[in-house]
Amino acid sequence: MAAKIKKGDRVVVLAGKDKGKQGAVTQVLVKANRVLVQGVNLVQRHTKATQADPQGGIKSKEAALHVSNVAIVDSKGKPTRVGFKIEGDKKVRFAKTTGEVING
């Protein structure tokens, strides 16, 4: 199945503690059907000191969200579903609300 959400897409969170927050997708975990969104769903992780990080301590990092809990933001700033259509000889993604082609 083609990816409806890709790295770099601007998305909004639909459910959970960060509902309504927007951010860019930094990573897509295809097998787990999850995405990492920049600045959203932050969790605290306790890390040991290492040579790379001699300080250690409590660090904040993004946790993955299920793809069903995020939606792409269209050009008007509203969440939209994604469809596919053929333009010429290419398959492209488009926003169902506006019909505009999504870059990427």
From Swiss-Prot:
Pfam families: KOW, ribosomal_L24. Belongs to the universal ribosomal protein uL24 family. One of its GO terms (cellular component) is ribonucleoprotein complex. InterPro entries: KOW (IPR005824), Rib_uL2_dom2 (IPR014722), Ribosomal_uL24 (IPR003256), Ribosomal_uL24_CS (IPR005825), Ribosomal_uL24_KOW (IPR041988), Translation_prot_SH3-like_sf (IPR008991). Signal peptide: none annotated. It comes from the Bacteria. This is Large ribosomal subunit protein uL24. The keyword Ribonucleoprotein applies. GO terms for molecular function: rRNA binding; structural constituent of ribosome. NCBIfam families: rplX_bact (TIGR01079). GO terms for biological process: translation. The keyword ATP-binding does not apply.
